[in-house]
Amino acid sequence: MKTLVALALVLAAPMTLAVDNMKAFPPAEEGMARYVIHVPEQADEAAWRVELQIGKTVQTDAANRYFFGGTLETETIEGWGFDRHILRQLGPMAGTLMAVDPSVPRVDRFITLGGDPRLLRYNSRLPLVVYVPEGVEVRYRFWRADDKIATAERG
């Protein structure tokens, strides 16, 4: 019985920690939404990154490349030392200007913020918390460094 109780405490501890950590993150302000990402534990978390993809699903032509303007800011929460990521405003959509056949139907596409990918540190002990305007989606995927390291040639 003691073993069962000890096992239950060990399994519940990370969940309790995650709930306690959420106290640091204020609820979303009016007109904003808060997204919370809990990532699974990995053996070597230093080799992993989380890529945020922030955007909206819109109807566009299939030929051009589109993106939204906007700046994802990172703020450290005073007194806690945790980071939160905030997109205060989704800017206008822009894209390439290739001519397309007007008779071709438009397609639904997820259009993201322009610029470099938003790669964040992987940490299974803390949630990734992202604040965005209402109507904006937050998607993510994982990146992992290869175990093989190549040596560059001098030249």
Place the predicted regions along the sequence by residue:
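Positively charged n-region of N-terminal signal peptides that target proteins for export
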Residues: 1-4
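N-terminal export/targeting and maturation segments
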Residues: 17-61
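Short, surface-exposed beta-edge/turn micro-motifs
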Residues: 7, 34, 82, 125-128
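Solvent-exposed loop and beta-edge segments used for protein-protein assembly and interaction
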Residues: 29-31, 44-46, 79, 122-124, ...
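Mature extracytoplasmic domains of secretory-pathway proteins
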Residues: 46-115
